[in-house]
Amino acid sequence: MIASHAAVVASAELLTSLYGERHRLCPTPNPELSLVLSCDRAIDLIELEQLCDAVGWSRRPLRRVREALEHSLLRVGLWRHDPRLPKLVGFARCTGDGIVEATVWDVAVHPLYQGAGLGKQLMVYVLDQLRAMEVDRVSLFADPEVVKFYAAQGWELEPQQRRCAFWYSP
């Protein structure tokens, strides 16, 4: 069945009202699952804490997490879409001057959603947003066991290949 033009417009308007103008739908192998990336929707601190718990990160005081988010150049959420209550299942944030350089921190995808290419889609979205700001150089720090994930996406590893990788605007 083909959706009517009005239904498609209503759906697009709903997504924009929930996630903002810069949202992006993520392709998924499951047609019943809708995932949305956005840097416009506010990040709920409790949901972020639950995501961090799920990926095994230590807890930080929520006051400090809120301050870190407020001082970040870019905050990106990946939500499992539900018109009543979207659920945060992925996250990344960037710091920097927003002109020349940025650093990516705290990239996480909930374990139930890992292995489907969502981390890659999250990072592509982050880089697209930084490109739109005309940021030329991006660095990131990651745990040693995931640095190869970034290398496979074209990030240049630091010489020791331990924790840091770089991306340069073409």
What are these regions (language model features)?
Residues 113, 117-125:
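Conserved acetyl-CoA pyrophosphate-binding loop and the N-cap/start of the following alpha-helix
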Residues 5, 9-63, 85, 161:
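Short amphipathic alpha-helix that is part of the acyltransferase structural core
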Residues 110, 143:
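Residue-level recognition of the GNAT/N-acetyltransferase active site
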Residues 123, 128-142:
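Conserved GNAT acetyl-CoA-binding A-motif
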Residues 63-84, 88-108:
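A conserved beta-strand-loop-helix scaffold within acyl/acetyltransferase catalytic domains
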Residues 20, 139-141, 151, 156-170:
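Conserved catalytic-core motifs of GNAT/GCN5-like acyltransferases
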